[in-house]
């Protein structure tokens, strides 16, 4: 019985006893969604980060507001026409940016990706959403909107669960995580890298 095992252990040699003390329990591991390396695990965070920074640079380089002279030339302009006027161009550039980043992840960095097509789709969707956010902030508030975008960037880098589990961050960031776009974009990309779990991918994009 158990007594025999204990006596056998006590009577064993030093090496057997040290092995038991160092590892009294042997775990049987079964990895459900394995990730090949640290770079692949961090790819969603840095991909989403680069898309956001690209949107900030886009807003800084391109003019979003019409000049007063141009407004006089175009009579009877409505507010929604002014708003939508250059958004399409912003979105097209954002699609090119995000597509380039995601293709670089897949073919240059060669990250692990179980669903490359969905990964690219997540990148495009993220690019469009970030471009619309940046465009709206800029056309509504001007340079103040760009500053808001930078502040949001800092908050999301610290509080979106990109580098550490969100549960390990201060309570403020835990409360903010559900409101941050980074959280959902990274969630969708992680699904593509490690493997899909139910409808988590589509929920993250939705």
Where are these regions (language model features)?
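Membrane-spanning alpha-helical segments of multipass transporters and channels
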Residues: 3-206
């Amino acid at each position: 019985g158990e007594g025999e095992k204990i006596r056998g252990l006590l009577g064993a040699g030093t090496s057997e006893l040290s092995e038991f003390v160092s590892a009294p329990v042997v775990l049987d591991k079964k990895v459900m969604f394995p990730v090949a390396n640290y770079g692949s695990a961090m790819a969603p965070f840095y991909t989403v980060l680069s898309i956001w920074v690209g949107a900030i640079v886009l807003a800084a380089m391109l003019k979003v507001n019409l000049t007063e002279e141009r407004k006089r030339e175009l009579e009877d302009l409505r507010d929604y026409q002014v708003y939508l006027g250059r958004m399409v161009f912003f979105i097209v550039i954002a699609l090119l940016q995000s597509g380039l980043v995601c293709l670089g992840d897949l073919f240059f960095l060669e990250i692990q990706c179980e669903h490359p097509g969905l990964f690219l789709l997540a990148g495009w969707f993220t690019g469009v959403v970030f471009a619309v956010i940046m465009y709206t902030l800029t056309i509504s508030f001007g340079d103040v909107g760009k500053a808001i975008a930078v502040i949001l960037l800092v908050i999301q880098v610290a509080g979106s669960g990109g580098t550490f589990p969100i549960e390990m961050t201060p309570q403020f960031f835990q409360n903010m995580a559900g409101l941050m776009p980074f959280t959902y974009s990274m969630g969708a990309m992680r699904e593509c890298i490690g493997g899909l779990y139910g409808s988590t991918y589509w929920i993250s994009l939705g």
